[in-house]
Swiss-Prot record:
Example GO molecular function: nucleic acid binding
Annotated GO CC locations: cytoplasm
Organism taxonomic ancestry: Bacteria, Bacillati, Actinomycetota, Actinomycetes, Kitasatosporales
Protein name: Oligoribonuclease
EC number(s) per entry: 3.1.15.-
Source organism superkingdom: Bacteria
Organism name: Streptomyces coelicolor (strain ATCC BAA-471 / A3(2) / M145)
CDD domains for this protein: Orn
Gene behind the chain: orn
């Protein structure tokens, strides 16, 4: 069984796949216990000038405050950034198509990866582990856990955001998931039988 989880966070000039540019990508790989493997990578990408010119003001302010905007002139190419991330991921995930993409609201990140880093995106499993989904369920089913979740210091830098996502999943695992080893097989089967949806 492949227990690896690939955590990726992207910073962009906006959220539009047709207009905006990927300007930072970071990755960490964990095992199933959420232990980080290796040092990870965090890479700044130099965007096309047009993407900077059309960047929404709120995004410009965010990337100025985080220091990312000042680093863009020294950024690398998309191809080089993809090669660096892929090298790190392959070091810890030997088989393509096995490890899911993980993070917070990773659907947007996956869209930019598919557009700009298709080889990397294709190396990942099609499934995702989205911590924001767990957070939304906790808000509805375990509000005390939701409202007491770890405070985020989010500076909107990719690697820091990943570390916070991993910490958040560790918290929800401890606060809302059934303690290990979970139910025995008979109990699990009995629970499953209550939730079978009939065909037709």
């Amino acid at each position: 069984m492949n227990d690896r989880m690939v955590w990726i966070d992207c910073e962009m000039t906006g959220l539009s796949l047709s207009d905006d540019a990927l300007i930072e990508v970071a990755a960490l790989v964990t095992d199933s216990e959420l232990n980080i493997l290796g040092e990870g990578v965090d890479i700044v990408i130099r965007p096309p000038e047009r993407a900077l010119e059309t960047m929404p003001e709120v995004v410009r302010e965010m990337h100025t405050a985080s220091g990312l905007l000042a680093e863009l002139d020294g950024g690398t190419t998309l191809a080089d950034a993809e090669a660096q991330v892929l090298a790190y991921v392959r070091e810890h995930v030997k088989e393509p198509g096995k490890a899911p993409l993980c993070g917070n609201s990773v659907g947007t990140d996956r869209g930019f990866l598919l557009r700009d880093m298709a080889t990397l995106e294709g190396y990942l499993h099609y499934r995702i582990v989205d911590v924001s989904s767990i957070k939304e369920l906790a808000r509805r089913w375990y509000p005390r856990a939701y409202f007491n979740s770890p405070e985020k210091n989010g500076n909107h830098r990719a690697l820091a955001d990943i570390r916070e996502s991993i910490a958040e999943l560790r918290y929800y695992r401890e606060a809302v998931f059934v303690p290990q080893p979970g139910p025995d097989s008979d109990t699990a089967r009995a629970i499953a039988a209550k939730h079978v949806v009939s065909a037709g």
